[in-house]
Amino acid sequence: ADIVMTQTPSSVSAAVGGTVTIKCQASESIGNELAWYQQKPGQPPKLLIYRASKLASGVSSRFKGSGSGTEFTLTISGVQCDDAGIYYCQQDWNSNNVVNNFGGGTEVVVK
């Protein structure tokens, strides 16, 4: 059976300078094979975090990924207006070598 990725919350509002926490749960263990992306309207997704906690090149250290197994978290600290967008977790490996298995997305609104 396919692994299901469940993201919470579906939407979150944050003040500039605040902190946002997004959670992603896998229906079975995926080790640390979890990526986080940010997407803005009309743009392709931008990789933020790979292997659960590794910061992609050029990405601000305000973004932090943690977790392993089935429970993962993306934390955005010192939220800036430019952080607004939709964030997705992605299972980037499974036993069937199926990729591009994304969570449902979390909209981040910055006030």
Swiss-Prot record:
Highest taxon of source: Eukaryota
Chain spans, region Framework-1: 1-24
Region called Framework-2, residue ranges: 36-50
Keywords: Adaptive immunity, Immunity, Immunoglobulin
Keyword Iron set for record: no
Annotated segments matching region Framework-4: 102-111
A Gene Ontology term for the protein's cellular component: immunoglobulin complex
Annotated region (Complementarity-determining-2), positions in chain: 51-57
Segments for region (Complementarity-determining-3): 90-101
Presence of the UniProt keyword Cytoplasm in the record: no
Protein name: Ig kappa chain V region 3368
Organism whose genome encodes this protein: Oryctolagus cuniculus
